[in-house]
Amino acid sequence: MAESNADVYASFGVNSAVMSGGSVEEHEQNMLALDVAARDGDDAIELASDEVETERDLYDNSDPFGQEDDEGRIQVRIGDGSEPTDVDTGEEGVEGTEGSEEFTPLGETPEELVAASEQLGEHEEGFQEMINIAAERGMSVETIEAIQREYEENEELSAESYAKLAEIGYTKAFIDSYIRGQEALVEQYVNSVIEYAGGRERFDALYNHLETHNPEAAQSLDNALTNRDLATVKAIINLAGESRAKAFGRKPTRSVTNRAIPAKPQATKREGFADRSEMIKAMSDPRYRTDANYRRQVEQKVIDSNF
């Protein structure tokens, strides 16, 4: 069966509404009502899908990583030079603290030190008695002094000295036993003094300070230790502690903007105690415990004393 014109138009998507009417205006209106794909000669305009990525605006100042996790990233801030930049090195600042600790004056002499001093004194009295007996048994004073000097210099006795002592009844075993006992008591006494002063490190620091800045006081301390004069030992150690605290315990106040003008040196007259009883009386004064200036004056007079 032959196709009609309407069937032919329908195969191209043209319905009867397009063909209806006899005027050109009516035909145009019917064509506009159809899908654009069905219009012969018209170009279809398609809009881009939202899924297509658009190019980022070159002037967009937003942070492209603003929504990302910062973990694992290193942030670097570049300064413009208008503000100082603090750099954290991970280390805390440490100021020099050499000698910055405050010195606490020594208090009452501990019983352990007093006991050690007394035991050493008793042993020395026994040694003097041995010397007297040696002299009574015929040993000359020159020989006794030579044996003493030999031990002080060499810290031991020669075979010749042992032989001379054996001649007057002092065997080698007896002499060695006596020497060991003497050394043990001396060590106990010295350790007690060091502990009283605050320990080995503190005692060495104070003694070295005296040797450097006041050699006379250092020698006075040696003499006081040898004579077991605990009052003088205490006074000199306190003086050394206060002197060292002044030298190292305070921050310097002079700077390039505060120039120090040296004062004219003035001679100071030093006068010590007349005797030991006068020194003990001054130390027994209540001000010695409560008044730092008074205590310092007393300690200085101890050093300047000649007894």
Curated annotation (Swiss-Prot):
Pfam families: Phage_T7_Capsid
Top-level taxon of origin: Viruses
Stretch list, region Disordered: 45-105
InterPro entries to which the protein is assigned, alphabetical: Gp9-like
Record has Transmembrane as a keyword: no
Native organism: Escherichia phage T7 (Bacteriophage T7)
Family membership noted in the UniProt record: Belongs to the T7likevirus capsid assembly scaffolding protein family.
UniProt entry tagged with the keyword Ribonucleoprotein: no
Name of the protein described by the UniProt record: Capsid assembly scaffolding protein
Keywords, sorted A to Z: Viral capsid assembly, Viral release from host cell
Protein function: Scaffolding protein involved in the icosahedric procapsid assembly. Coassembles with the capsid proteins to form the procapsid, in which the scaffolding protein is found within the external shell of icosahedrally arranged capsid protein subunits. In a subsequent step the scaffolding protein molecules are released from the procapsid. Facilitates assembly by binding to gp10 hexamers but not the pentamers and locking them into a morphogenically correct conformation.
Biased composition (Acidic residues): 45-54, 83-101
Chain coiled-coil ranges: none
Gene Ontology biological process: viral capsid assembly
